[in-house]
Amino acid sequence: MSWQIISKALMVGLGVVGIVCWGPEIWAKPSPSQILHLQIPILGTSVNTQHLPMGLVSQIVIDLYERRDQDGLQIQFHTEPGKFSLFARQSIHQAITRALPAANLPVASWTVQLKFPYAGLTMYGESLSAMVALSVVAMAKGEPLLEGRTLTGTITDQGHIGAVGGLQLKILAAYHQHFQRVFVPSVYDETDGDWRTPFLMHVSPVRTLEEAYRGLTGQQLSARP
């Protein structure tokens, strides 16, 4: 079942520098030609109309642009059409602020804006955070994400891809959406049990940011001096 037709009351769960949360009418942006724009796939879990657990693939919209000041990285979250829970915002913020220094990127004048483009739904959880953060890095470096690939996991303070739950459901959701490769944490959630790889699909455990970024882009994480 497509997740778009689930009841709007359903809360979607996925698994400063400051966090700013505003309605879209409040922000003043540069001209569209100065804004980098990317829509990325993320894996999550929810329940269907029979209240059974299910995996799903949804989208996050990222805008990135450079300001004229040097007042520090700003990470902002749209409140429309969908929203991010406080935990999701904190997880994304933490992942971005860990990934950008690992890539040796100057960020003092950047603004990152994120949108969950599903009216009436709220994004919960942390498992989208590594995918969002490494996508921001790729945008900043001008390196496209490879088609048919996605990542689920967090970013730890040691620079590793952290464990998340619901892997089997997420892998199956990606398979049904015709993804060729899914990157998962090499350290598993012990309560999650084993997962199986669908036919003709690659599931690749990754430990470090470097491994995950190379898998998503085919490029090295760290920007050259």
Predicted regions and their residues:
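Peripheral, non-AAA+ core regions of ATP-driven protein-machinery
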Residues: S2, G18-C21, E25-P225
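N-terminal Sec-pathway targeting helices
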Residues: M1-M11
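Hydrophobic membrane-insertion alpha-helices, especially the h-region
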Residues: M11-I19
